[in-house]
A protein has these predicted regions:
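A helix-centric hydrophobic-segment signal that preferentially recognizes long
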Residues: 1-184
């Protein structure tokens, strides 16, 4: 009788260790997603710091393009109002789209091509966009790893028991796959 009790106790201990280990692994992966999004946001902040300078440098040339500047302001406001990482991921695409449209519109203004300030800001913006792309890829990699982990048996039981949900990938806005050509 003692042997059966010890065996049952051993099985319970092993199961408890497995549950704790799995839970801790899921917590670590979930926190890694938030940490990687913070890296994306660092690059977004760099972009947000550049955008007002770019807008003010181009607004004088592009007075009739008022709607694009309003779109950019609206997208920045929506991003700033997003509370969760998943909400920010979704609203980030709106700013990307507005900024892409600004770059396309800028091609119609030859005077901008000779403006050194605008050219320098565009170079900085291009570098920032590259950094954002790298960080987004890393973010999507971490999200993918987490999502795969919570779908695998038997981890999916622990994930469901503790309320771990699938996380949202960063997806570009429709049409963003085609990069705007900017010639300054």
């Amino acid at each position: 009788m003692k042997k059966i009790g010890l065996i049952i106790l051993g099985v319970i201990a092993v199961l408890a260790l497995w549950v704790f280990s799995t839970y801790n692994s899921l917590v670590t992966k979930n926190v890694a997603i938030d940490g990687q999004w913070a890296q994306v946001e660092t690059q977004y902040q760099r972009r947000f710091d550049l955008i007002p300078n770019l807008v003010s440098s181009t607004q004088g040339f592009m007075k009739q393009e008022k709607t694009i500047f309003e779109e950019i302001a609206k997208a920045r406001t929506q991003y700033g109002g997003a509370k969760t990482v998943d909400e920010k991921v979704q609203t980030a695409g709106q700013l990307d789209g507005a900024l892409s449209r600004l770059l396309v519109i800028m091609e119609n203004y030859p005077d901008l091509k000779s403006n050194q300030t605008v050219a320098q800001l565009m170079d900085e913006l291009a570098g920032t966009e590259n950094r954002i792309a790298v960080e987004r890829k890393r973010f999507n990699d971490v999200v993918g790893d987490f999502n795969i982990t919570i779908k695998k048996v038997p981890t999916n039981m622990i994930a469901g028991m503790f309320g771990f949900k699938e996380r949202v990938f960063f997806k570009s806005e429709e049409g963003a796959q085609k990069a705007p050509k900017v010639e300054l």
